[in-house]
Amino acid sequence: MLGEWILVDTEDEMVAIFLQQRTYFMQQQKLLSLIRQAIEDYNMIEEGDKIAVGVSGGKDSLALLHAMKILNRFYPKKFELYAITCNVGFEGMDFTGVRKFCESINVPYEQVDTEIAKIVFEDNKDERPCSLCAKLRKGAMYKRLGELGINKIAYAHNKDDFIETALMSLIYEGRFYAFPPVTYLPEVGVTVIRPMMYAPEKGVDNFVINQGIKVVKNTCPVDGSTKREYAKQLMEQINRDNPGTKDRIMHAVVNGRFEDWPEVHRN
């Protein structure tokens, strides 16, 4: 890790370690830069905010939590940072690693235990369970955030997620749209922010690998077979055939002037 003393036997080993640590540092700075740009473009953080990162245990949410912890040390607007997980009750899901990770970076952690899995897959038997699961999961977290006095939740949707959402919107809804960077939910008094909107998935992957962050295996029975996964694979194929398509779609999303998107605040 960066900043640790490492004994080496040869000059070649020393050079290799230096290059590895330099790459690690550059990737960390790149991700932090993209997150900060999004935060400032859409005024996501205000002085005195209490922000919880929604942590699923996956690479994106853990990367965002770690990056937000680093940002918390030097960002000019002071904010309190928390982490929250909704345990929907899938068999085999274990968030012990998430709790330990939060303890290691000194972030208060809250786990909300529910029976959402039973409701979605046994009681409801909906052929499209993802939207119901997401709605119930968010509702459970928002309720707990209100009890804790936390006013914002940060979701780890990255650049690829925004692009895939726009593609799904075209395919399944007949419109061009993506979720907004900032959304205030008056019924629960919580503001949703998405600070990783400019960060490509590959960059997040590299950050997680270099930080040595251990992710939690997703035991959802429909993981990997959803409409979003279909859109992801389709987008990858389109981008291979037409390099640069992802960037052009993201440009269109950011400049789409969607009704519920806030204005960009750039100097």
Locate predicted features.
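ATP-dependent adenylation/nucleotidyltransferase module used to activate substrates
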Residues: 22-166, 172-175, 202-210
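Catalytic subdomain that performs nucleotidyl-dependent activation
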Residues: 160-240
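A short, charged, Gly/Pro-tolerant segment at domain boundaries
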Residues: 244-267
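Intrinsic-disorder-associated, low-complexity terminal segments enriched in Asp/Asn/His/Tyr and depleted
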Residues: 9-12
